[in-house]
């Protein structure tokens, strides 16, 4: 990979991420590579701020933070399909990030320049809110948003119990009506996030599909389902005419929806390009390490066993 311009995006409000970003930038500049550094938060679209004055697409984006920082970068960069290399600095679980100690590896940049890495192309979701009550007004009010992990729907009423009633259509076919705390539509990448907490399945990122999971449904028959990635899903609030539903993209509030409106969710045209420093990465090894499955426990026991 020929490195001409690198963005270093770090987690907003994290002292350690900022310090690591400054050090990383100095190391990149010492190689004669142009670098731009900026912070990123849930409501801060750093990418647009950097692109507007420069109009130059980076060769590589370095993200320093947790999975939330990576998700934000992926949403804003997907249309450019720029490789994202992320490190867990000031973050939590870090399913999408590398260990920050790898930043100290003197061979890091030469490995990247010599293409000693793998690229994982991750499916994303695209959603839009539209009005459907007046056939002449369908699609007139539109609010587009993207997600790498998930798009989910929850009640935003403050004066009543936070339950909502949502209707699901798949490819124009009525499928179910969910009454409960909400509904999650997840990608394979997001299958180890909020969707997993609701009892949804874990999908290998090499599979392109959409998981539909109810959040605390008031029915034992409401089970998670997996549908083809090419499906067109529609979620709309039904029942109480005063009900308002908050739409969240990767854990960030993105839009409000009320009766008479619906959200259409489909597979996004572009993918998030995740750079993996292992040339033969193992998704299952990541699962055992991050979720502390038996495989990682056995490895630890073997390491501690007397020789």
UniProtKB/Swiss-Prot annotation:
Which InterPro entries does the annotation name?
Answer: ATP-NAD_kinase_N, ATP-NAD_kinase_PpnK-typ_C, NAD/diacylglycerol_kinase_sf, NADK
Its catalytic activity? NAD(+) + ATP = ADP + NADP(+) + H(+)
Q: Where does NAD(+) bind?
A: 67-68, 149-150, 179, 181
Q: Specify the superkingdom.
A: Bacteria
**Molecular functions (GO terms):** ATP binding; metal ion binding; NAD binding; NAD+ kinase activity
The enzyme's first-digit EC class, named in words, is: transferase
Please report which protein family the annotation says this sequence is part of: Belongs to the NAD kinase family.
* Name the UniProt record assigns to this protein: NAD kinase 1
């Amino acid at each position: 990979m020929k490195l001409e311009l690198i963005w270093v995006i770090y987690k907003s409000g994290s002292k350690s991420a900022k310090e690591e970003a400054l050090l990383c930038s100095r190391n990149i500049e010492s190689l004669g590579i142009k670098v731009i550094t900026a912070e990123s938060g849930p409501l801060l679209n750093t990418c647009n701020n950097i692109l507007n004055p420069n109009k130059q697409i980076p060769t590589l984006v370095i993200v320093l933070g947790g999975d939330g920082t990576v998700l934000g970068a992926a949403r804003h960069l997907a249309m450019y399909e720029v490789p994202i290399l992320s490190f867990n600095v000031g973050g939590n679980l870090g399913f999408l990030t590398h260990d920050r100690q790898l930043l100290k590896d003197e061979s890091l940049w030469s490995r990247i320049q010599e293409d000693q890495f793998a690229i994982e192309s991750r499916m994303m979701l695209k959603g839009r809110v539209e009005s459907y009550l007046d056939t002449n007004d369908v699609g007139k009010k539109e609010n587009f948003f993207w997600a790498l992990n998930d798009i989910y729907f929850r009640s935003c009423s403050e004066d009543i119990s936070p339950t909502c009633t949502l209707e699901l259509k798949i490819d124009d076919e009525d499928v179910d009506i969910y009454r409960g705390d909400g509904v999650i539509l997840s990608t394979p990448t997001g299958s180890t996030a909020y969707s997993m907490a609701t009892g949804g399945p874990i999908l290998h990122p090499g599979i392109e599909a959409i998981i539909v999971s109810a959040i605390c449904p008031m029915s034992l028959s409401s089970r998670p389902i997996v549908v083809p990635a090419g499906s067109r899903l529609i979620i709309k609030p039904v029942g109480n005419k005063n009900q308002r539903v908050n739409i969240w993209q990767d854990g960030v509030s993105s839009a409000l929806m009320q009766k008479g409106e619906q959200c259409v969710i489909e597979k996004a045209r572009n993918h998030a390009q995740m750079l993996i420093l292992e040339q033969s990465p193992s998704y299952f090894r990541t699962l055992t390490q991050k979720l502390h499955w038996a495989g990682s426990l056995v490895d630890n026991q073997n390491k501690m066993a007397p020789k």
